[in-house]
């Protein structure tokens, strides 16, 4: 009975693609359905014309120079070697966080990450990259506290007066004030994305107004993307959920064994026990003890 809508701003990667190849993002018509952090640019039009040929021509003529110019700095994940490689593998551009998700072969070590995500540090998911992200978030958090508690500081001076592209407030505005708009949302599937069960959360476009959040039914994703990207993520989610609901400790172990970072069964058991031995942080300290919830099967 709880009304829930998940949001992610990764879909704005289509604007990064457009700007990079010299197109005005405001002239783009697009669609990128899938699962959270696993969405694919099925529709990419510029002023009514298919923009994929423009992207192909730009990649052919410019991508190597684009990467070379940024080898000592940062390459946006959206236009990284990983993203372009996935485009070549699947025939559709991965959007937003999808290039970061990729396959295990993009993430085996730091040098591999530098190959696929470029720049001086190999993207934002390396130790140095994460430190940058966390530092930025901490700085913004401190700004928010100052704006909230310091009467001498005006939020508008810190954050500006221009409307951002984030969807939270416009969606609320649509639901409450009937200012209709189309948004990218994560909701129960209920037939919106073909091939996925109704009770699984999918990321699709939706019309939002006083009547609620109404997902649009999208075209099926290519079968290869479904088999190699969508279904594996869906099944991993189902295994994780079943482990939580059943309390089966062996299912947690399987999740570690299934990782390409795992090198042996014994290593997997050591990792599991180390994770379960960690002190819980807030608010997990107030829920059920994880070691009481998860048990080995009775015949273990």
Regions found by a protein language model. Give the residues of each.
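Short, acidic/small-residue loops that bind anionic groups at enzyme active sites
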Residues: 1-11, 30-32
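Long, compositionally biased stretches enriched for glycine and/or charged residues
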Residues: 14, 20-300
């Amino acid at each position: 009975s709880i009304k829930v809508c998940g949001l992610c701003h990764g879909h704005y990667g289509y604007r990064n693609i457009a700007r990079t190849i010299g197109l005005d993002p405001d002239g783009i018509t697009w669609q990128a359905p899938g699962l959270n952090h696993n969405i694919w640019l099925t529709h990419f039009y510029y002023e009514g014309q298919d923009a994929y040929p423009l992207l192909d021509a730009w990649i052919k003529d410019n991508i190597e120079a684009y990467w070379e110019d940024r080898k000592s700095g940062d390459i946006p994940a959206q236009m990284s070697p990983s993203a372009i490689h996935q485009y070549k593998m699947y025939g559709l551009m991965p959007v937003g966080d999808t290039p970061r998700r990729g396959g295990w072969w993009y993430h085996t070590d730091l040098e591999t990450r530098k190959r696929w995500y470029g720049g001086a540090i190999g993207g934002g998911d390396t130790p140095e990259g994460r430190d940058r992200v966390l530092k930025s978030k901490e700085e913004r958090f401190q700004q928010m506290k100052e704006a909230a508690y310091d009467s001498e500081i005006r939020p508008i001076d810190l954050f500006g007066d221009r409307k951002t592209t984030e969807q939270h407030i416009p969606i609320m505005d649509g639901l409450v004030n009937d200012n209709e708009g189309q948004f990218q949302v994560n909701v129960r599937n209920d037939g919106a994305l073909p091939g996925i069960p109704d009770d699984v959360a999918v990321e699709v476009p939706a019309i939002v107004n006083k009547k609620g959040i109404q997902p649009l039914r999208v075209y099926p994703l290519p079968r290869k993307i479904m088999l190699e990207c969508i279904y594996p993520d869906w099944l991993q989610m189902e295994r994780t959920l079943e482990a939580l609901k059943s309390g089966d400790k062996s299912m947690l172990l399987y999740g570690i064994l299934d990782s390409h970072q795992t090198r042996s069964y014994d290593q997997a058991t050591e990792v599991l026990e180390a994770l379960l031995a960690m002190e819980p942080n807030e608010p997990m300290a107030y829920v059920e003890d994880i070691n009481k919830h998860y048990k080995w099967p009775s015949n273990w």
